[in-house]
Amino acid sequence: MTDTTAPEAGAPAAAAGGARRPFFRRRKVCPFSGANAPKIDYKDVKLLQRYVSERGKIVPSRITAVSAKKQRELAKAIKRARFLALLPYVVK
């Protein structure tokens, strides 16, 4: 009765001897911070529409990489534009 330490057939590549590199997620940078960053304005409908989904909902900052402070400004500008009928509340 001898024990063998051979890797099993269903073992991951790291156990077989080949080390796998960890997945590297690139850090997202806020598009509204920096020298040439656009100003958030409720009248700039073209800019605001990039941060509204096709159903009319505000896209979360984890998807758009907008900082928390700028996300609050963006949400306020979108809501103001909706109130003034520059943007629709819902899209059919």
UniProtKB/Swiss-Prot annotation:
Any idea which GO molecular function terms this record carries?
small ribosomal subunit rRNA binding; structural constituent of ribosome
- Report the Pfam families cross-referenced here: Ribosomal_S18
Q: Which InterPro entries match?
A: Ribosomal_bS18, Ribosomal_bS18_CS, Ribosomal_bS18_sf
CC annotations in GO? cytosolic small ribosomal subunit
Record-level GO BP terms: translation
Please give the SUPFAM superfamilies that the UniProt record associates with this protein.
Ribosomal protein S18 (SSF46911)
For this protein, the record's Gene3D superfamilies field holds: Ribosomal protein S18
Alphabetic keyword roster: Ribonucleoprotein, Ribosomal protein, RNA-binding, rRNA-binding
Q: What does this protein do?
A: Binds as a heterodimer with protein bS6 to the central domain of the 16S rRNA, where it helps stabilize the platform of the 30S subunit.
Q: Subunit details for this protein?
A: Part of the 30S ribosomal subunit. Forms a tight heterodimer with protein bS6.
Q: Which family does it belong to?
A: Belongs to the bacterial ribosomal protein bS18 family.
Q: What is this protein called?
A: Small ribosomal subunit protein bS18
